[in-house]
């Protein structure tokens, strides 16, 4: 399809003040996705009974035995909605990394809201087994709160959630230490969710962490916990630790251990046995590739690997077992917290996208920074993960804009091109973004359910992204509801 576009060079280089998140006095609305509890007598997808329905089922059923849904930006791309839809066609939905810093809100068919941070998104599909893998850090009070909320609303969790015996435990003190660490960093703070994720992974890395399997040995648990708490007290002056705290924590975790026991499993064995049995497995990634500890905008990253490699290390399955990976990317870009954001729109333009897209964090409620879609970063994510297809979300948010920009290239100040996404943040600060300007569309597309019915300009936008990135867009989101997903 041919169309006209123009190139525009951003004359304002990325500046350091953009990297540090400033709280914006906006009301924190929250995003949501809609899902329903599946009953045996109802169809697995509530889709229109036309050719689009047939195409969608064919698309989903063609996915490989082990498939994954991963974020392509800095998180908050809308992965939960796609996972919820796909989960109805998979036997297992598994989390492989992260912790309660990942979050989304889902609703059942009766409008009941579930705020989930640890339990995999497949929990509302009654035939789906949910696995929390060894790469996840588990905050037991948070997990039990989610389970209680689900059970009280009629969603059975018994026998449907497995927690890896190799997963590390995230304690309340990890969260306290997380806040103390941010306070130490002052103006250069990272913008963590303060859920204790970094400190827990740090404990894991220096090998004094406590794993789920340790709950089965309460005779040695107090000594291990004492080492952890003493280490935190020696590191942070503001952290007060004494014998009474240890006694209270040990008693609390004795109760937790008893309650968690039915959920504990050797999930590495479960996953590999399921692969041998030809069961279909969907891996749900938390956060996104641009927050990856190795490949993201370090140090403004998370502490795990939310890219393709994290699937294998976080679940204990072989790389050759992993097939289709779907990258989820917003039609524009958002970021929560500090860190580089080359295509960020400051001022009124950013506010417009923020309110139109209701861009406020599910986990923190913080307003998200907004900007144009960064093709350079997206291509980088596609290279790392080898995506077979993309899910372009929130395309409807761009409706009514007179023009839409794509950040298609980075250039040095002298105009020479820079052909990759740099690791050096100082270099990234100096680069300028080259934009391609495309026409907008002046109509609401949120009720459209067939790609052919899109305005020409919307089709041009989607197809230009495919052309620039080299990966097909198979799924397009035009609203929060389950039915607001177009299969291309």
UniProtKB/Swiss-Prot annotation:
Positions of GTP binding: 75-81, 103-105, 368, 394-396, 477-479
GO biological process, one term: 'de novo' AMP biosynthetic process
Oligomeric and partner information: Homodimer.
Binding site residues for IMP: 76-79, 101-104, 193, 207, 287, 302, 366
Protein family: Belongs to the adenylosuccinate synthetase family.
Enzyme Commission no: 6.3.4.4
Classification via Pfam families: Adenylsucc_synt
GO CC annotation terms, alphabetical: chloroplast; cytoplasm
UniProt keyword list: Chloroplast, GTP-binding, Ligase, Magnesium, Metal-binding, Nucleotide-binding, Plastid, Purine biosynthesis, Transit peptide
Catalytic reactions on record: IMP + L-aspartate + GTP = N(6)-(1,2-dicarboxyethyl)-AMP + GDP + phosphate + 2 H(+)
Protein name listed in UniProt: Adenylosuccinate synthetase 2, chloroplastic
Cofactor, free-text remark: Binds 1 Mg(2+) ion per subunit.
Organism: Ricinus communis
Keyword set includes Plastid: yes
Cofactor(s) needed by this chain: Mg(2+)
Record-annotated active site: 76, 104
